[in-house]
Amino acid sequence: MNTAIVLAGGSGKRMHSEIPKQYMQLNGKPVIYYSLKAFEESEHVDEIILVTAKEYIEYVRNEIAGSQFAKLTKIIEGGKERFDSVWAGLQQISEKGYVYIHDGARPCINQNIINACWETVVQTDACVAAAPVKDTIKVADADEYAINTPDRKTLWQIQTPQVFSADVIKEAYSRLYEQNCFDGVTDDAMVVERYGNSKIKLVNCGYCNIKITTPEDMEIAGIFLKG
């Protein structure tokens, strides 16, 4: 069975909102709606697990879930950090099949992205949606002085979904929690890099799959979704 774990535990602090960004309105729908819809319509996904804050579980059940999302089989409580929420989701699935892990604040995911990741993961066991960096990147010291300029040709900006064979990602996360070393863990690919044996293939998914973090992102995502 192939599962999509959709993370909806973020806050709205940088959006200057008391409502988590995943539940803010975007083109007349909650932001999270678009991710759920994309996975619901995918032939490569059998079930969806939504991980959210405890206080929003009933809201999701009453206002978002329903017949339109038949694949949404579980709505569960997340953890304090992103990796805690992913781990909570992973404990709900079997060792077989593939797992899409996706940030619910990326509403512009589409079938092309899902399909491209699928075609890659069945060959590699581990891949992430990404895009080559367009801007020059500087490494700074503690005083915000530039100290180094990495070769831009080697840099990619990482997105979601991050897709893995279920046994690969569950084993990596199990070892993460066994080692109890969470410093610097920002995404799932990093967990596999540290504790797995699979190389991570980057899948060029372009620049429209943005993560909503600021009010400006909401405006841009709205334009992308209108197509």
Swiss-Prot record:
InterPro entries: IspD, IspD/TarI, IspD/TarI_cytidylyltransf_bact, Nucleotide-diphossugar_trans
EC number from the UniProt entry: 2.7.7.60
Catalysis performed (reactions): 2-C-methyl-D-erythritol 4-phosphate + CTP + H(+) = 4-CDP-2-C-methyl-D-erythritol + diphosphate
Keyword Oxidoreductase: no
Lineage top rank: taxon: Bacteria
Example GO biological process: isopentenyl diphosphate biosynthetic process, methylerythritol 4-phosphate pathway
Site (Positions MEP for the nucleophilic attack): 152, 211
Enzyme type, top EC level: transferase
Pathway in which the depicted protein is active: Isoprenoid biosynthesis; isopentenyl diphosphate biosynthesis via DXP pathway; isopentenyl diphosphate from 1-deoxy-D-xylulose 5-phosphate: step 2/6
Keywords: Isoprene biosynthesis, Nucleotidyltransferase, Transferase
UniProt keyword Transferase present: yes
GO molecular function: 2-C-methyl-D-erythritol 4-phosphate cytidylyltransferase activity
Marked site (Transition state stabilizer) residue numbers: 14, 21
Similarity annotation: Belongs to the IspD/TarI cytidylyltransferase family. IspD subfamily.
Job description of the protein: Catalyzes the formation of 4-diphosphocytidyl-2-C-methyl-D-erythritol from CTP and 2-C-methyl-D-erythritol 4-phosphate (MEP).
Name by which UniProt lists this protein: 2-C-methyl-D-erythritol 4-phosphate cytidylyltransferase
Gene name as annotated: ispD
